[in-house]
């Protein structure tokens, strides 16, 4: 694992102050040391192209059809979730997009209606970069498919997703919702 802090220690003579830990670091340095720092940190870096590809870890491949409100409720015994105790993450494939639309006060959330390979309707939500998602859909399935999905019309979009199931509460109604973290 790459540690930004350890790499910065190798250049410490260039800083007026610095600190951090393996996941993050901060520094102050004079303007004239910016370029020498850039050169040294890149020279010392042991990162490979493979290190720059995000690694996606799931707990288990699990069809969305297997997830129930009861199962999601039982996950609460694993809480609290955070960096050292991540929430359970699963994967499923062959999910057909029947509709997608942007919601949220800032138009920054994508809701999707999906159909599982068993024909089960699924409510999903995506909090990531919507434009990148749309670009992926356009590139893989075409602009017509994207526009059809945005209108709730038949299309050829089929996704594999990494997701976390949740219980959504809206106006006192509870429903199962799948938060998409990664897609392909």
Where are these regions (language model features)?
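Acidic, two-metal ion nucleic-acid-processing modules in DNA metabolism proteins
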Residues: 1-184
